[in-house]
Regions:
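Proteins with a high burden of low-complexity, intrinsically disordered sequence enriched in S/T/G/P/A and R
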Residues: 1-5, 107-110
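A short secondary-structure junction signal
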Residues: 67-70, 99-100
């Protein structure tokens, strides 16, 4: 807990932003559908610029934003390699990979 407080104190200066611009989330073990439970009702959306895509995320209302940072390189690669290809996203959670594919020129026209 002390380390978390130290990180929260240091982040605004390290990121050169105001403390109110930083959203903190603390994960704990979830069971069943608990991870999808609504935590807040702000409904505030933030636009994330990722490659050619503009993606809306909700940082407050749920534990997950739906935009996973570790998937970013793959989403960008999909956009780079999608031109002229059909794209079917069978494991879609948020559709962000599909957005990149569409922007990269993928389609389903035959």
């Amino acid at each position: 807990e002390r380390r978390l407080d130290e990180v929260r104190s240091a982040l605004p200066a390290a990121l050169d932003t105001a403390a109110e611009n930083i959203v903190y989330k603390q994960r704990s073990r979830q069971r069943g559908t608990e991870q999808y439970t609504k935590r807040d009702s702000r409904g505030e959306l933030l636009t994330v610029h990722e490659g050619r895509a503009r993606l809306l995320v909700n940082l407050h209302d749920y534990i997950d934003t739906g935009l996973f940072l570790d998937h970013r390189p793959l989403r960008l690669r999909i956009g780079q390699e999608a031109a002229g290809k059909d794209f079917l996203n069978l494991f879609c959670y948020t559709g962000t990979a599909t957005v990149h594919a569409a922007l990269g020129g993928a389609g389903t026209d035959r």
